[in-house]
């Protein structure tokens, strides 16, 4: 699915546990321009619900997609404003 997205930056938070994937995602999103997409790579299964919940409750971001693969969880987050 990632081929459908023009990924601006990739954030590798593999090995980090809650709340660090969300904290680092927020920091990285703050540095992007409107419309740009951040790919987040995580190994914490909790990141699936954590990043979804954060994006749902945060103005200016949209969770475009999430993928679960070989021990890596991928999240695609767009900055909307």
Curated annotation (Swiss-Prot):
Keywords of this entry: Plasmid
Active site residues of this protein: 18 (cysteine persulfide intermediate)
InterPro entries cross-referenced by the UniProt entry: TusA-like, TusA-like_sf
Recorded superkingdom: Archaea
A Pfam family: TusA
Family statement: Belongs to the sulfur carrier protein TusA family.
Name of the protein described by the UniProt record: Putative sulfur carrier protein VNG_5061C/VNG_5236C/VNG_6059C/VNG_6467C
Organism: Halobacterium salinarum (strain ATCC 700922 / JCM 11081 / NRC-1)
């Amino acid at each position: 699915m990632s081929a459908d997205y023009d990924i601006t930056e990739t954030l590798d938070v593999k090995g980090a546990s809650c709340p660090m994937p969300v904290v680092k995602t927020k920091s990285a999103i703050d540095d992007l321009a409107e419309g740009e997409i951040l790919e987040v790579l995580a190994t914490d299964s909790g990141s699936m619900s954590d990043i979804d919940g954060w994006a749902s409750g945060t103005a200016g971001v949209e969770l475009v997609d999430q993928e679960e693969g070989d021990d890596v969880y991928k999240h695609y987050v767009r900055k909307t404003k």
